[in-house]
Amino acid sequence: MSTYTVRGSFPARDGPQQFEKEVEAPNENVAEERVYSDFGSQHNLKRTQITIEEVA
């Protein structure tokens, strides 16, 4: 599996919160899905509230 860096933002109390997270995944699509899953469970966000800007 490769390591991907996912960058994006989500709404927080003080405005948009930027994030950069490294994820191990077989491809970019799976890395993106894992970020949606992790941030959804940790921050109680829906997928539509998370904006992913780049997967590298």
UniProtKB/Swiss-Prot annotation:
Subunit structure: Part of the 50S ribosomal subunit. Binds 23S rRNA.
Keyword annotations of the record: Ribonucleoprotein, Ribosomal protein, RNA-binding, rRNA-binding
GO cellular component terms, semicolon-separated: ribonucleoprotein complex; ribosome
Gene3D superfamilies for this protein: 3.10.20.10
Ranges where the record places region Disordered: 1-24
Protein name: Large ribosomal subunit protein eL20
GO annotation, biological process: translation
Keyword Magnesium among record annotations: no
Family per record: Belongs to the eukaryotic ribosomal protein eL20 family.
Protein origin, superkingdom: Archaea
Alphabetical list of InterPro entries matching this protein: Ribosomal_eL20, Ribosomal_eL20_dom
One term of GO molecular function: structural constituent of ribosome
A Pfam family hit: Ribosomal_L18A
